[in-house]
């Protein structure tokens, strides 16, 4: 066993864990040596690793916690246990952990790198490897029986890690440099005066205001003749068919369209005698308009269907 004076110091509150694989005599001897180091003001507490999560220690209770340090202990410390250790350690407190590791990944045991990573993820810093040594035959047998690993790449590693000098969730004000206020660009007085229009200038006799009625003369107000709007050569020549240009704006397209559309003016409805509209005195015996009042020529008159059948 290395000199404990390098692991704990006088006056500290120290916690030591053990499990079913730990030797009872070795545990008593180890605790006795620790008490000699931390005495008289220090204290050593002993915890079963399986009951640590149920012990409900207050935050920041211990200056140092030793995991797996009792002779004969073969234990893999879970992430939950390591997180609890980080909680009950005082700011700046130290964790010394010792457990078996494997050289290759994928085994039941962690690799040294994996163990260091788990400690950092638990909130600990300054992770330092103190030693790594091969197992003796008795320790190898314990790994096989207790952990179920029968590889030849097993060794024991001891690592020291520290809790940061602040509590988890604590806050501190950051002294950030003050932001410089942007300076406004300087304004040239001459340029400002050039673009400034005084209200009094609007009534100044020297200011000439254009009369909108004088902008157009009489020629501009005349309605142009349609022929003057035609483009050069538009629709000219009797030997060729008149055709409007694409996107015609001179009115030729509308003119040609009007020529194609037949007149829809209704013609006056003719009658056999031509006198039906004058009244019954001028209607023949078979006239369907008998009994109806006189109407204007071309006026639309609705006839009784019965009279149409009789006719």
UniProtKB/Swiss-Prot annotation:
Chain span(s) of sequence motif Cx2C motif 1: 273-276
CDD domains linked to this entry: AdoMet_MTases (cd02440)
Subunit description: Monomer. Interacts with ndor1. Interacts with chchd4.
Role description: Component of the cytosolic iron-sulfur (Fe-S) protein assembly (CIA) machinery required for the maturation of extramitochondrial Fe-S proteins. Part of an electron transfer chain functioning in an early step of cytosolic Fe-S biogenesis, facilitating the de novo assembly of a [4Fe-4S] cluster on the scaffold complex NUBP1-NUBP2. Electrons are transferred to CIAPIN1 from NADPH via the FAD- and FMN-containing protein NDOR1.
Domain notes: The twin Cx2C motifs are involved in the recognition by the mitochondrial CHCHD4/MIA40-GFER/ERV1 disulfide relay system. The formation of 2 disulfide bonds in the Cx2C motifs through dithiol/disulfide exchange reactions effectively traps the protein in the mitochondrial intermembrane space. The C-terminal domain binds 2 Fe-S clusters but is otherwise mostly in an intrinsically disordered conformation.
PANTHER family, alphabetized: ANAMORSIN
Designated name of the protein: Anamorsin
Species classification: Eukaryota, Metazoa, Chordata, Craniata, Vertebrata
Gene: ciapin1
């Amino acid at each position: 066993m290395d000199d404990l004076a390098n692991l704990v110091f006088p006056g500290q509150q120290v916690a030591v864990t053990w499990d079913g694989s730990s030797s009872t005599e070795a545990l008593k001897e180890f605790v006795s040596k620790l008490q000699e180091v931390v005495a008289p003001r220090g204290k050593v507490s002993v915890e079963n690793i399986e009951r640590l999560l149920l012990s409900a220690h207050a935050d920041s209770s211990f200056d140092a916690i030793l995991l797996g340090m009792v002779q004969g202990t073969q234990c893999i410390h879970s992430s939950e246990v390591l997180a609890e250790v980080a909680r009950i350690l005082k700011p700046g407190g130290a964790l010394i952990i010792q457990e078996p590791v494997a050289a290759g990944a994928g085994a039941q045991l962690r690799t040294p790198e994996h163990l260091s990573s788990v400690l950092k993820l638990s909130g600990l810093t300054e992770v330092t490897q103190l030693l790594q040594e091969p197992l003796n035959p008795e320790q190898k047998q314990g790994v096989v029986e207790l952990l179920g690993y029968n590889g030849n790449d097993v060794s024991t590693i001891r690592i020291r890690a520290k809790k940061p000098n602040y509590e988890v969730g604590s806050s501190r004000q950051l002294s950030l440099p003050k932001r410089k206020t942007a300076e406004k660009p300087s304004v040239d007085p001459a340029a400002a005066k050039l673009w400034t229009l005084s209200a009094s200038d609007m009534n100044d006799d020297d200011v000439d205001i254009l009369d909108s009625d004088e902008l157009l003369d009489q020629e501009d107000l005349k309605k142009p003749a349609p022929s003057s709007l035609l483009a050069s050569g538009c629709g000219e020549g009797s030997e060729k068919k008149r055709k409007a240009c694409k996107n015609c704006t001179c009115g030729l397209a509308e003119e040609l369209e009007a020529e194609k559309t037949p007149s829809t003016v209704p013609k006056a409805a003719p009658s056999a005698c031509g006198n039906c509209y004058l009244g019954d005195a001028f209607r023949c015996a078979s006239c369907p308009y008998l009994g109806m009042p006189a109407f204007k020529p071309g006026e639309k008159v609705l006839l009784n269907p019965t009279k149409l059948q009789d006719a």
